[in-house]
Amino acid sequence: MALRRSMGRPGLRPLLLAGLASLLLPGSAAAGLKLMGAPVKMTVSQGQPVKLNCSVEGMDDPDIHWMKDGAVVQNASQVSISISEQNWIGLLSLKSAERSDAGLYWCQVKDGEETKISQSVWLTVEGVPFFTVEPKDLAVPPNVPFQLSCEAVGPPEPVTIFWWRGPTKVGGPASSPSVLNVTGVTQRTEFSCEAHNIKGLATSRPAIIRLQAPPAAPFNITVTTISSSNASVAWVPGADGLALLHSCTVQVAHAPGEWEALAVVVPVPPFTCLLRNLAPATNYSLRVRCANALGPSPYGDWVPFQTKGLAPARAPQNFHAIRTDSGLILEWEEVIPEDPGEGPLGPYKLSWVQENGTQDELMVEGTTANLTDWDPQKDLVLRVCASNAIGDGPWSQPLVVSSHDHAGRQGPPHSRTSWVPVVLGVLTALITAAALALILLRKRRKETRFGQAFDSVMARGEPAVHFRAARSFNRERPERIEATLDSLGISDELKEKLEDVLIPEQQFTLGRMLGKGEFGSVREAQLKQEDGSFVKVAVKMLKADIIASSDIEEFLREAACMKEFDHPHVAKLVGVSLRSRAKGRLPIPMVILPFMKHGDLHAFLLASRIGENPFNLPLQTLVRFMVDIACGMEYLSSRNFIHRDLAARNCMLAEDMTVCVADFGLSRKIYSGDYYRQGCASKLPVKWLALESLADNLYTVHSDVWAFGVTMWEIMTRGQTPYAGIENAEIYNYLISGNRLKQPPECMEEVYDLMYQCWSADPKQRPSFTCLRMELENILGHLSVLSTSQDPLYINIERAGQPAENGSPELPCGEQSSSEAGDGSGMGAIGGIPSDCRYIFSPGGLAESPGQLEQQPESPLNENQRLLLLQQGLLPHSSC
């Protein structure tokens, strides 16, 4: 007897199926396909198992498919059993039935081009009632009747509904669906319904009934724009009392509490109002209240404001001049304000022009002026106007003083002596004529260019070209919010921590993008130092469309936290800066960190394994990475700091191959793929979390130790994803069952033992970071230094057409890899030796052995050679 088993598609979460076991009948059925067992209808209880069987006769190794409601059953266990050579039985097992499993089932098999179908069976799943309509939350006025609805279905039927008001039964029994009529409530009340059938009962969600009330008083009332007759007002509405606000009233008075106040009613939203026809230069006060269906709110506080005044409305009268031996005395009548809003007068403004082009403007206190700086041999034209703090009034009629007159006369300049206006008129005419000629010339050019193309269209009397109005743009530079910590809306405590590390935006220049994610990005930048030199840094910033103050505060708290750290294996803060933005938008906060040339540790490990030019990382290097991280975490734990997000992606690799613990919060925004949202909570890196963190949201230094164990596993696997093939939602059940990450290939037993200790279910049984550091340093000390002859970083390529000694791929002479053509700063590089067409592969174009370095003592070690010597322990390496 042969047995063939097939399950649902891997990777899909299996449904909980249910059913009633049917009997296997003796295999004496007629040739063909049939459903075994007698029932055409099956009824099972929710949660019970069921097995459906069908028989196939006269076929060798048939491919039996089970169908439900016309679709292939994929998420259930299916077994094919061979009774004899051409007699097979197909078995469908449903372990625990749910309502969704009810339906019409049959099996089918292909016989050449023909599909044979068995008889079908209808599966009914019975259980406690299922709610299709539950009572909803409501906000109602006091003592106003309302209704609540409830509906539940079987099978089995019938379903009976009972209503509850808090702990008291208030209605039922009634058939489903049911409506409860409530005469009204006077306080917050909860209602729920119960559904009963012969299988049991189910209770609906509670419906919370809240009382509506008049709204609260508005606040933040602000007069935003003021002119001489208008004022714009804006405010923030108070709590709406669970009812829609329909209008607000703005009350305006000359003094707070004045009886004769102007009231303006405006529909809302928006919560703004334009007050018109106000008196100029007048003190006012205003207040606002809003209303909903239950009534108005109290008024907000009185807000005083003053309208602007008016410029003088009249020109000075009786403007005349008297010649004297010492000069020219000018006199005019005082301007009396016609409107109280004009305010106090300032000095008068006197303007004069002579025929020779000389002109000037004087400010005169009083109504008399003595003009001495003028040429009596030339005609003189004068004007005067009144002014105040608001502006200038209208000019008087021109006063012409002729070179032949002994006194000036007010009126139009004389034609014989006033040639200046004539010149101005001629110039105006010339400019106008030139403009018209230019317009005609451009029009003619367009007609010449497009005339032939549009002749047929114009002949029909149709418009040749249709234009649409373009957008208009404001060429003025938009207003910018000053980039200060006060403009971000963060707490005073956080501002105090960041004030001494705030760096002006002008002090650095942003460069290329290093990485970005759902909420933020990292960019390279050049920071100008006090001595004028520049240093390369990394700048983390939120996205431009992130404007919530909570996101900004969380982002900057990471910087405030890093400010306190001082350890070679913990990322240290360089500073914080703010990037100004136009259109009144909040500045973008930026956290400035040291630039780590090799990026994050996870990306480096991944490149060593599956990059364009993979390279080997010796075991000493991998253990050294672990020692560095343990040193950094030992320092953090000694300062009572809990990281909560330790992973290879959150460790940075410096130029000298030392590892720094970093990313105290922002990393989950950059690497959002490793995070999972549980319910309404924030996204969590569940595959790095300890059991107590997953179960109780509890984070301690012991949970950081668990994450360190997962990070060690990442390092030993060169960046593989932990728990591959297991969904985030299934991690807790996987771990609570006693499962842990498997020992990676080529991982030392001592290293894996340390990992496994980190994953103890009892947090107190996990080792401390001090213990981990000491054990790892002990392991590192016992590892032998790899000789360069055994170092798999090097692959010698023979001449073109000849196989390499180690069986590696061949490259012809002169051929370059893509990395050689670059600047040599990538993960892999190739250095050519023209004499024997021999290539050396390494993480960065390294020399083949230290001996080759000695042959060229005058050449300094390049970056890649230094990396190899660091990995082999031939250069000093920073330690704890």
UniProtKB/Swiss-Prot annotation:
One of its GO terms (molecular function) is phosphatidylinositol 3-kinase binding. It is found in: Cell membrane. The active site is at 645 (proton acceptor). Pfam families: fn3, I-set, PK_Tyr_Ser-Thr. It is a single-pass type I membrane protein. The modification Phosphoserine is found at residues 456, 808, 859. GO terms for biological process: apoptotic cell clearance; cell migration; cell surface receptor protein tyrosine kinase signaling pathway; establishment of localization in cell; forebrain cell migration; lymphocyte activation; natural killer cell differentiation; negative regulation of inflammatory response. Residues 441-880 are cytoplasmic. Abundant in the brain and lower levels in other tissues. ATP binds at residues 514-522, 540. It is an enzyme of class 2 (transferase). Residues 508-785 form the Protein kinase domain. One of its GO terms (cellular component) is endoplasmic reticulum membrane. Residues 852-864 have a biased composition (Polar residues). Residues 804-827, 842-864 are annotated as: Disordered. Belongs to the protein kinase superfamily. Tyr protein kinase family. AXL/UFO subfamily. Receptor tyrosine kinase that transduces signals from the extracellular matrix into the cytoplasm by binding to several ligands including TULP1 or GAS6. Regulates many physiological processes including cell survival, migration and differentiation. Ligand binding at the cell surface induces dimerization and autophosphorylation of TYRO3 on its intracellular domain that provides docking sites for downstream signaling molecules. Following activation by ligand, interacts with PIK3R1 and thereby enhances PI3-kinase activity. This is Tyrosine-protein kinase receptor TYRO3. It comes from Rattus norvegicus.
